[in-house]
């Protein structure tokens, strides 16, 4: 019966279900530094596999190497014999004294887009060691609509520069790899946050704006708390400046920026100041290589304010499909990234 029904409708069906036209690339981001690192290997280009390449037919063999041998320890009886000793000691102090603070920077690509993976990672730590708040959130984000840990909206007149495709920004990138400008002199640029639905993100704790230095001393922002409209002036005197908007937790916050052109805006931080906090710095299309362009002085200023105890790098997916099994070029590039992070976040 089903076959007869299908044959009867076949003449009405299209010849092809999927269009052969190229889809929109509006939301497809390309890591320019990844392409540069790949192109910088002249010998590698000639090794790219084709359909007739004999290398493609060779089986992958994993050979034993004289690398670092990790002890066979389980999570339950981990003794900290590796590189995480300071981090676990800080967690121990937090667990025993309830006074220490721990902060984690989680850098990733589209795998952590919309706070995926990271929100569970954050919840686990906050459930065990305390702490409330979603952490640092950018001014704009391509994944704002899919994020449940915080509701995020913004106006369309923000000028955005990302370390993914801008090598020489107008001003230094923030710890999130972005810098934003409210350059529209006619309409005020705005950003709105609303507390999420997860257990430890039901309020916006200690909303604090992070912004950079500029000659413009006339920048202002306005926002409402209850029925009161509050106006504050930006003082962009230092490499990194902070402005606390409320000492009491809020359910939502909408901030309007006026006369703030040329002032680099980085984002807002939301945390209660105790326990563990995790900042998700995800970026679609990122290979991790752009981190090597962080400005050391600016990052040290962020470290003074946020004090990261652990940095997680979650990359690799965007490096695949370049037609080669030789990833030494990526190894060298990521070594530069890690060395730069050590400069930016000493300790």
Predicted feature residues:
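Serine/threonine-rich low-complexity intrinsically disordered regions
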Residues: 27, 31, 41, 50, ...
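Weak global preference for isoleucine
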Residues: 9, 17, 30, 48, ...
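Membrane/wall-proximal cationic-aromatic binding patches
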Residues: 36-106, 174-176, 184
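Alpha-helical cap/lid subdomain in secreted, periplasmic
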Residues: 1-41, 170-208, 212-221, 227-229, ...
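Serine-esterase "nucleophile elbow" of acetyl-processing enzymes
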Residues: 75-158, 162, 194-284, 296-307, ...
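Charged heptad-repeat coiled-coil "rod" segments that mediate homo-/hetero-oligomerization
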Residues: 162-172
């Amino acid at each position: 019966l089903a076959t007869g029904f299908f044959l009867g409708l076949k003449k009405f069906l299209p010849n092809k279900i999927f269009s052969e036209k190229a889809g929109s690339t509006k939301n497809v981001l390309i890591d320019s530094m990844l392409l540069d690192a790949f192109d910088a290997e002249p010998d590698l280009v000639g090794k790219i596999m084709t359909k007739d390449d004999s290398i493609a037919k060779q089986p992958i063999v994993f050979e034993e190497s004289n690398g670092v041998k990790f002890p066979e320890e389980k999570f339950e009886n981990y003794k900290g014999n590796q590189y995480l000793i300071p981090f676990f000691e800080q967690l121990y102090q937090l667990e025993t004294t309830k006074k220490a603070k721990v902060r984690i920077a989680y850098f990733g690509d589209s795998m952590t887009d919309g706070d995926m993976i990271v929100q569970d990672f954050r919840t686990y730590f906050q459930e065990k060691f305390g702490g409330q708040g979603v952490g640092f959130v950018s001014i704009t984000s391509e994944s704002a609509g899919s994020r449940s840990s915080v509701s995020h909206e913004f106006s369309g007149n923000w000028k955005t520069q990302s370390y993914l495709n801008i090598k020489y920004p107008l001003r230094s990138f923030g710890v999130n790899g972005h810098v934003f400008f409210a350059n529209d002199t006619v309409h005020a640029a705005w950003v709105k946050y609303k507390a999420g639905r997860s257990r430890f993100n039901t309020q916006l704790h200690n909303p604090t704006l992070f912004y950079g230095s500029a000659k413009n001393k006339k920048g202002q922002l306005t926002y409402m708390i209850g029925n009161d409209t509050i106006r504050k002036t930006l003082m962009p005197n230092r490499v990194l400046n902070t402005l606390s908007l409320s000492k009491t937790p809020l359910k939502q916050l909408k901030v309007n920026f006026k006369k703030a052109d040329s002032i680099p805006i980085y984002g807002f931080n939301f945390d209660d100041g105790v326990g563990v906090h995790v900042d998700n710095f995800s970026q679609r299309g990122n290979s991790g290589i752009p981190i090597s362009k962080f400005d050391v002085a600016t990052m040290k200023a962020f470290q003074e304010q946020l004090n990261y105890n652990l940095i997680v790098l979650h990359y690799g997916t965007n490096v695949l499909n370049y037609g080669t099994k030789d990833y030494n070029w990526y190894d060298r590039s990521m070594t530069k990234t890690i060395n730069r992070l050590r400069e930016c976040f000493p300790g």
